[in-house]
């Protein structure tokens, strides 16, 4: 009998772990049907964007910039190219060309930013995952959002930064010099450090995370992949994103959505269209649609909190979180 219960315990633990990881990523694009997000449209964009390396200063970098700008104009957005010379430390600098598109909201409250970078890493990488996946997630996500004839309450700014790969220079140019920064309430940043696997939510905040976690769960992502241990480790790592610049230099809260599977593709010639996992792109699509629908209509003026939450993924229920000694389960 003792052996039976030991076996049963191991089986339950094994099944729990399996279901936890299996539930982290969608296996079909059917989950996107309610949003009208087309993976095929996104992949069509990506074929063009990742056709050649497009590092800052390269010929194809200009092609990608113009392509994104034209797509924003075709959707009827207000558009802008922010040209700015930026230097980092004593000897790193370049002229950056950030692409900005705006959807006007119905109120004068804080705005929402959809963020990614459009430059690829040096001459070898095709930049399909890092961060072409972010570019196409935003382009197709906004098209799907607008197709519902939804008028957001908050202004929505699409910011495609330049020169991320050589020191987050485009993000610095935007945060230090653009007037839009003063009214930003939240940033959603789409990134990659590999070519597949689940996309994890990693926050950036200078304060406590209670309200941010609550609103993340209220957005009802279909496949939330997040836990506070991963967040704690992330904060100790030296790898910053564009979102880090917003937090450190402007005290703006935000969420990173990033995948790290097949990490050996990162910053190499293997970061190609063919290597990007389709299900990973579907996961990013689920995030942007759920987050966009939610955060475009809530008050973003105060996302600060008096509490820190401990949170983790949980089978079936999706996420479990705890505030001090009080436990809550949200599905």
Each model region followed by its residue ranges:
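Acidic, Ser/Thr-rich low-complexity intrinsically disordered segments
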Residues: 1-4, 8, 303-331
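Hydrophobic membrane-insertion alpha-helices, especially the h-region
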Residues: 4-20
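Soluble extramembrane regions of membrane proteins in the secretory/endomembrane system
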Residues: 25-320
């Amino acid at each position: 009998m003792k052996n039976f219960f030991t076996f049963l315990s191991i089986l339950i633990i094994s099944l729990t772990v399996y279901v936890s990881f299996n539930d982290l990523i969608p296996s079909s694009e059917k989950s996107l049907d309610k949003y009208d997000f087309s993976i095929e449209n996104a992949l069509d964009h990506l074929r063009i964007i990742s056709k050649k390396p497009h590092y800052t200063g390269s010929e194809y970098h200009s092609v990608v910039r113009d392509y994104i700008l034209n797509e924003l104009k075709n959707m009827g957005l207000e558009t802008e190219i922010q040209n700015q010379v930026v230097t980092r430390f004593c000897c790193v600098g370049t002229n950056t060309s950030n692409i900005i598109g705006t959807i006007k909201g119905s109120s004068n409250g804080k705005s929402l930013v959809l963020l990614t970078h459009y430059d690829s890493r040096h001459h070898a990488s095709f930049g399909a995952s890092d961060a072409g996946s972010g570019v196409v997630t935003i382009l197709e996500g906004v098209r799907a959002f607008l197709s519902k004839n939804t008028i957001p309450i908050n202004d929505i700014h699409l910011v495609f930064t330049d020169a991320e790969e050589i020191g987050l220079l485009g993000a610095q140019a935007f945060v230090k010099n653009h007037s839009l920064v003063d009214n930003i309430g939240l940033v959603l940043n789409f990134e990659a450090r590999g070519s597949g696997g689940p996309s994890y939510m990693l926050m950036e905040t200078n304060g406590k995370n209670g309200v941010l976690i609550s609103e993340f769960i209220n957005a009802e992502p279909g496949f939330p992949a997040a836990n506070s241990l991963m967040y704690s480790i992330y904060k100790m790592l030296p790898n910053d994103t564009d979102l880090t610049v917003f937090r450190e230099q402007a005290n703006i809260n935000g969420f990173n959505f990033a995948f790290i599977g097949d990490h050996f593709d990162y910053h190499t010639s293997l970061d190609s269209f063919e290597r990007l996992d389709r299900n990973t792109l579907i996961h990013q699509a689920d995030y942007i649609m759920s987050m966009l629908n939610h955060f475009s209509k809530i008050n973003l003026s105060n996302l600060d909190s008096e509490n820190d939450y401990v949170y983790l993924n949980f089978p079936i229920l999706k996420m479990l979180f705890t505030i001090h000694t009080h436990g809550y389960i949200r599905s």
